[in-house]
UniProtKB/Swiss-Prot annotation:
The lineage of its organism: Eukaryota, Metazoa, Chordata, Craniata, Vertebrata. This is BTB/POZ domain-containing protein KCTD3. It comes from Homo sapiens. WD repeats lie at residues 174-218, 224-263, 270-305, 310-342, 354-404, 412-449, 457-504, 510-569. Residues 139-170, 736-815 are annotated as: Disordered. SUPFAM superfamilies: POZ domain, WD40 repeat-like. One of its GO terms (cellular component) is plasma membrane. Accessory subunit of potassium/sodium hyperpolarization-activated cyclic nucleotide-gated channel 3 (HCN3) up-regulating its cell-surface expression and current density without affecting its voltage dependence and kinetics.
């Protein structure tokens, strides 16, 4: 018994009412009924009035399974209305006071926390863009207008519509696709170019522009789209466009479909067209005036702003890419690095394909999983010095260089580092550093790069600098936009300091900004309105046109309530460079544990060791290790990775809880899942035979990578099909036969590439082309490639980097 707590209150002897014995976490407390019940609607008033069932120990004391150390100052407050912390942190005490419902105490503690936190942010806070209005929905407007504008005939329209996204008919003329439900208010992706940024929401995109005099202004809002956006690209300087050099271009993609708009400075915008890659789009970006889309399956789509021509090219399965000037470099799963000269686009008149040239082949034949190209100051239109760093599926990091004196023999292997035991997922070669990241919880290794007259040197050569981790947990069932909207970096120009952005858990309002070279923490930012950060990016903006002014670097964060917040990283880096404080990296152990209070982690398939229902079954929300989605490690060296359990709101911060009361994502998702199941059930015929739509859905799920997860709606649909007559062994045999046939077709259609030399003399890169790369037929007026000529999917042998999406993640759903 705690002697200082039992019977020590004199009011009990003064007729203040019945004495109540409490057992809080094993420690006995004695107090009066009046002391516990003077605050209405508290935990104690409900407990003593019988509204809450009580559990008593062997002595008859009411047992409360809470922290006794934190309960002591709370009981003292109930007795005296005075607060004595008694060594308990304000944060812990506030959590306990909220549990007990002691409202006066909670208000005092929240006010104490407000002393250090402001709704206007810290000195690094730069601006706030409120959530935009959601545009009105127009039924079938996008597809119809695009077809008429591009002049697609019926065959091409069918090829595009039946590619990978089966549709279900809803009420009236509206058609929607089965897909992963996404909160329509949440900012999925933030991207920027020069003084413009674009925020991608589930069904529309919004462009903002900054001017020194007026600040940030909303310029363009796209029409409402029936499908969910997964990729976005922005070009704020289109040279030679139809409206002069003041044109801007915005593109968004979902699955295989791409839609492109032209935006003028005045805010008016017009749709350029809708294009199809024929396979899921993994990357969407601009190289000059060209819009480029790539897919891991081995397709590259290019649209030129001058010629208005869309072309799709077949290459081998792509595992990485980078850009250098007007060149697109592709790292492929056969160990080769290829490049495409965009200045020679749209096509070579001889055989109607892109100029794809093999640049280098890895000596170990490992897949090229990361690429980084550095153009030295010696490089020019007539120059021929280039440096390329790349990482492989076996964990090797290599640097190859093209010397002026080796023009005819191709790039030479310069350095090799074998410090990673997992596939390399990111690599960056800059002026002063070489940075590589592997799939082991974003393990980072860095080296200093020695240069002589701007070119990499062997004396004394690259030396190890730092080793650290950018721990970042992700949900296994996240939407396809999560990877592009939450990319850790590194961000920044290659001749300047670069940074990583660390988001430890998916549902958090805090980010850590760290130097990419050493891992040193530059700053940590916290949402000013305490809402969850759903996406982020780092861009440099030229806010002033005055002489001597320099671009400033900003961190843009998108939030689940639709707002965008901006943070001044230039000021943060200036402050940290002047500071002499001890270097701090990522979150400390205490900070990490506090962040992990929001979720459960498990190294087994069960979230809890007891027989109670796992929260993963209840909430369908799991966490996994970051960057494990690539799964490019060789089969012989595959290791069992920890599987994180589900998230749950345990000891959730009230600041987060207060903001999340306005976020209805989970209820929205559950509502969509219920309607999804009903629509699929109606679509299955009574006799159990599959109609063409069901067959498409089933085929899409059968061809998907084995590591992908199915959405709950598709799983229920499959079970109903089995119950209505389909036999399990027949399905297994059919899948096995189709997989075998696909493998045979893949071997028959495999493209043989000849190893070519490097750069030819006189040019920046040589003109040695790949002997033959099949070009998908396309029309000069924006036609799409036919699925019948698409290359066989390589995902049977190469896992898709998009595996964290559900099988139906690109398909729309019905309300």
């Amino acid at each position: 018994m705690a002697g200082g707590h039992c019977g020590s209150f004199p009011a009990a002897a003064a007729g203040s009412g019945e004495i109540v014995q409490l057992n809080v976490g094993g420690t006995r407390f004695s107090t009066s009924r009046q002391t516990l019940m003077w605050i209405p609607d508290s935990f104690f008033s409900s407990l003593l009035s019988g509204r809450i069932s009580t559990l008593r120990d062997e002595t008859g004391a009411i047992f409360i399974d809470r922290d006794p150390a934190a309960f002591a100052p709370i009981l003292n407050f109930l007795r005296t209305k005075e607060l004595d912390l008694r060594g308990v942190s304000i944060n812990v005490l506030r959590h306990e006071a909220e549990f007990y419902g002691i409202t006066p105490l909670v208000r005092r503690l929240l006010l104490c926390e407000e002393l250090e936190r402001s709704s206007c942010g810290s000195v690094l806070f730069h601006g706030y863009l409120p959530p935009p209005g959601i545009p009105s929905r127009k039924i079938n407007n996008t597809v119809r207008s695009a077809d008429s504008r591009n002049g697609l005939n019926s065959t091409e329209g069918e090829a595009r519509g039946n590619g990978t996204q089966p549709v279900l008919s809803g009420t009236g003329e509206e058609t929607v696709r089965l897909g992963f439900p996404v909160d329509p208010r949440k900012v999925l992706i933030v991207a920027g170019h020069h003084n413009w940024i674009v925020a991608a929401y589930a069904h529309f995109a919004v462009c903002y522009r900054i001017k020194e005099s007026s600040g940030w202004q909303q310029v363009f809002t796209s029409p409402y789209l029936d499908w969910t956006i997964e990729r976005v690209a922005l070009n704020a300087k289109v040279v030679g466009g139809p409206h002069g050099d003041k044109d801007k271009m915005v593109a968004v993609a979902s699955e295989s479909s791409i839609i492109l708009w032209s935006v003028q400075d005045g805010g008016s915008g017009s749709e350029i067209g809708v294009f199809s890659l024929g396979v899921p789009v993994d990357a969407l970006f601009f190289i000059g005036n060209q819009l480029v889309a790539t897919s891991h399956t081995g397709k590259v789509g290019v649209w030129n702003a001058v010629t208005q021509h869309w072309q799709v090219q077949d290459v081998v399965p792509i595992t990485s890419y980078d850009t250098a000037g007007s060149f697109l470099l592709l790292g492929c799963n056969n160990g080769s690095i290829y490049y495409i000269d965009m200045q020679k686009f749209p096509l070579r008149m001889k055989d109607n394909d892109l100029l794809v040239t093999e640049l280098y082949h890895d000596p170990s034949n490992d897949a090229i999983t990361a690429l980084s190209v550095y153009l030295t100051p010696k490089t020019s239109v007539s120059g021929n010095w280039i440096e390329i760093a790349y990482g492989t599926s076996s964990g090797a990091v290599r640097v190859i260089v093209q010397h002026p004196e080796t023009v005819g023999s191709g790039p030479q292997l310069f350095q090799t580092f074998t410090v990673h035991r997992s596939p390399v997922t990111k690599i960056m070669l800059s002026e002063k550093h070489l940075v590589s990241v592997c799939a082991d919880n974003n393990h980072v290794r860095t080296w200093t790069v020695t240069r002589f007259r701007g070119m990499i040197s062997t004396q004394p050569g690259s030396t190890p600098l730092a080793s650290f981790k950018i721990l970042s947990l992700e949900e296994t069932e996240s939407h396809g936009s999560y990877s592009s909207g939450n990319d850790i970096g590194p961000f920044g120009e290659r001749d300047d300091q670069q940074v990583f952005i660390q988001k430890v858990v998916p549902i958090t309002n805090k980010l850590f900004v760290r130097l990419s070279s050493t891992g040193k923490r530059i700053c940590e930012i916290q949402a000013v309105d305490c809402t969850t950060i759903s996406s982020f990016t780092v861009r440099e903006c030229e806010g002033s046109s005055r002489m001597g002014s320099r671009p400033r670097r900003y961190l843009f964060t998108g939030h689940t309530n639709g707002s965008i917040q901006m943070w001044d990283l230039t000021t943060a880096m200036d402050m940290v460079n002047k500071s002499e404080d001890k270097d701090v990296g990522g979150p400390t152990e205490e900070e990490l544990l506090k962040l992990l209070d929001q979720c459960d982690l498990s190294t087994s398939r069960c979230a809890t060791p007891n027989i109670s229902p796992a929260t993963s079954v209840v909430q369908h929300s799991h966490l996994r290790e970051s960057n494990s989605s690539l799964q490019l490690q060789h089969h012989d060296t595959t290791h069992e990775a920890a599987t994180y359990g589900s998230m749950r709101p345990y000891r959730e911060s009230p600041l987060l809880a207060r903001a999340r009361r306005t976020e209805s994502f989970h209820s929205y998702r559950d509502f969509q899942t219920i309607n999804l199941n009903r629509n699929v059930e109606r679509a299955v015929p009574e006799n159990g035979n599959l109609g063409p739509i069901q067959a498409e859905v089933k085929g899409a799920t059968g061809e998907c990578n084995i590591s992908e997860r199915k959405s709950p709606g598709v799983e229920i649909k499959s079970l109903r099909e089995l119950d209505s007559g389909l036999e399990v062994h027949k399905i297994a045999e059919g899948f096995s036969e189709s997989k075998k046939r696909s493998s045979e077709d893949e071997n028959e259609n495999k493209i043989e590439f000849r190893k070519k030399g490097g750069f030819e003399g006189g040019g920046f890169l040589g003109r040695k082309k790949v002997p033959y790369l099949a070009s998908s037929p396309s029309t000069s007026d924006g036609g799409t490639d036919s699925p019948g000529t698409a290359s066989p999917s390589p995902t049977k042998t190469t896992p898709s980097p998009r595996h964290k999406k559900s099988d139906s993640s690109g398909q729309e759903y019905s309300l």
